[in-house]
Amino acid sequence: AFGKHLIYHFDSGEALHIHLGLFGKIRKQKLPAAESRGAVRVRIVGDTHLIDINGPNICEILVEHEFMDLINRIGPDVLRSDANPTLAFEKIKKSKAPIGRLIMDQTVMAGIGNIYRSEILWRQSVHPKTPGYRIDQRTFHRIWEDARALLTIGVEHNAIITVDGARASSRRYRERVNIFAKEVCPECKGKIRRFEISNRRAFVCEI
């Protein structure tokens, strides 16, 4: 994976490129398989299991040069060991765009979604509307490291968890987040303000 882009490589040299978007799903089941659910765009069958991919934003076959073009367009992925965070910082420090937009721009840094955006910036005391050029290297390093830590936890538990000590088994994500879609800041008890950045919900405590 590179951020939100999933890549399946085949012996032919081609690659299957998947971006699930907001509504796409990956379903894995043992063979023999039950009847498929919904509109299946791709079914990958192995010796013991199969994978169905439903409703992705992107579902395409890439040849080698197309795959390389895609990878070159994607910013460093906070979860990849070979990621170079300096590439993201170089773009951020030159930008007038708000940091809340920049860290969700997959060409700047890859992997951060909408809930993580508000949570990471709140945890690091950074207002989402702060222009990129006002983010110094130390602040960016904190954002990057927190993003990597939280996304690693998310992968391990298959759940978004940004509250220290929260249980992954809880079905209600509101119990696992600090300010996203909430009314009151857990730290200062001040009112959480909701607004939009690039037509996506964002949350901030301004006290």
Regions flagged by a language model, labelled:
Residues 1-207:
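Structured catalytic/nucleic-acid-binding cores of DNA maintenance enzymes
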